[in-house]
């Protein structure tokens, strides 16, 4: 399971606080550095291979020449993955680029649409138009992509219910296999953050954001999409494999400036509960030379327990890391697991946490957690997912 961070964008979105640089794209030296890092970490990559995914995120990976994408994939071990995703901006897609991605072996594309209102797109400093987004989607379809994810944003002050509903309904006409919806957040270091500090932008109320979120839930449910994670919906059989593995804390290798990694023991059982393990390679807990032997097996089910993060230096790979405590691992399991419809094992809840006992009455538990479809698991019901952060905070 490999993540490649591409910290380059042609322009910066109003709300973006991620590490990235505005440019026409990276030079060959950057690609050389990522390939060198992949080679240096080949043992880690082999140890995380059970999930069998490669994900190019950013930033804007579609600023990369096709040659760079292919070279980096080769350095990671090849071009054949159960799921190989590249994030794209609609403005970067041409018939030739879409066909080139497909010919490399990329089998999933995640496209940032955000809105189909041209005025809202201009306010966000997005480079594409509503019509351009639709054209890009059709180009990807024509290139043979049968697994496309589309991102949208809600909770924007100035985005009316009608505007959001129009965006969702139009995207449903395209019938993408996967849809992600994210609430606008004010990030430190973003242009929007500066506007908010100066009083030039006021956040939409929680009540209005909640109404928009549940409008999306209703529209996608009626269209046959499965709501399998707080921000993610999929047609049957089209859940995001890579992201689902994150939510079960599967080990992954993050390549490139600013990328994070998680290493250590891993039991595929938890992952298989979210994604059928039809393509999982046989796996045994590795000895991680790259973590100084910190990939230690915890008591009970094996859990990855070493987190590292790369520097943001574009000229070479350096990283730092920490061995996670049992308490930190448990917190991550709860925070990530309760974002999903599958929830978390009941064993993660302390007996003193009355809210964690499904047998208690609705009044006593305040409807915080209910049994999920997975035996012995508890989840936050969809009607409370908008306030999931508050519920999770009460459990950790």
Name what the model sees in each region:
Residues 376-380:
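A generic structural motif
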Residues 350-361:
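Short amphipathic alpha-helical interaction segments
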Residues 1, 20-44, 50-288, 292-350, ...:
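C-terminal scaffold of the Radical SAM
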Residues 7-18:
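Local cysteine-cluster metal-coordination motifs and their immediate loop/turn environment
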Residues 367-374:
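A short, conserved structural fragment
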Residues 385-396:
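Short, amphipathic alpha-helical interaction segments positioned at domain boundaries
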